Amino acid sequence: MNIDMIRAAAARLNGHAVRTPLLNSSFLDQIAGRRVWVKPECLQRTGSFKFRGGFNALSAMDPVARANGVIAFSSGNHAQGVALAARMHDTSCVIVMPSDAPALKISNTKAYGAEVVLYDRAGESRDEIGVRLSAQRGLTLIKPFDEPEVIAGQGTVGLEIAQDAQVHGITDADVIVCCGGGGLTSGIALALEADAPTLRVRPAEPENFEDVARSLRAGRIEKNTAATGSICDAIITTQPGDITWPIMQRLCGVGLVISDTEAMAAMAQAFLHLKLVAEPGGAAALAAALYRRDEIEGSDVIVTISGGNVDPAMFARALDSL
């Protein structure tokens, strides 16, 4: 992984991905005790940053392999990103999704033209299912985070943050990233290392699923023992990736951990003050900025809202939580 791959991904994505801005609200600033800058990837195509990695991975593939079709496993956002990217490249797509994924994510993935295969998150391995179907059908597997071209695509978020930070005069700030397996976090970290080295990347995770935060403290990969138990489904993973982990270990600061209650409150704040729809996992970084303010340094903080694919009932719960 290197910055040249991320710059190449930016060229492929140009004209296809939404170039999201940095947004600010004085109301959020008051809660956080500093200026809060929000990178709203909930406004990205398919409702999350995952479109970037999916499209870049398909664009970079060998044309013959791409024509044979692709397969991915995902709780929903990578699923939708790959499904739309496959449709845009006129190829077939199979998505392996947990049966407890939000209904909206499952229905949207099907609407993009993908074949959806459901599995039991608590008792089955999506990796094993994906590898088996890939071999049986001759499909190319696009992993959700531990895939170089996927990381490169996600890293384009970091290039844009660096550009906008310069415009706004932000030279010293924590950049808090919603973190599951680390594809977005490591991609942003690589981009900022090259283009804005004074900005510090910090992962945000739900409590009891903070494998990256624990890994950073321990200096080695730590695993989560549970596979379910948080509303932040989009960022629940077993452990950091083999590719993403060494990047995060080298470039990331101390991890931040938030509760489900804080995630819902952040969803409500994003809607009230920025008119943004965030899903629970996508609001984790904002929750850390607002409710873990004593763990953050500097007069500015930049956060990703990484996704907005939330079921209406969950969103209503969030709005009622304040």
Residue spans of the language-model regions?
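PLP-dependent amino-acid enzyme catalytic core
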Residues: M1-L322
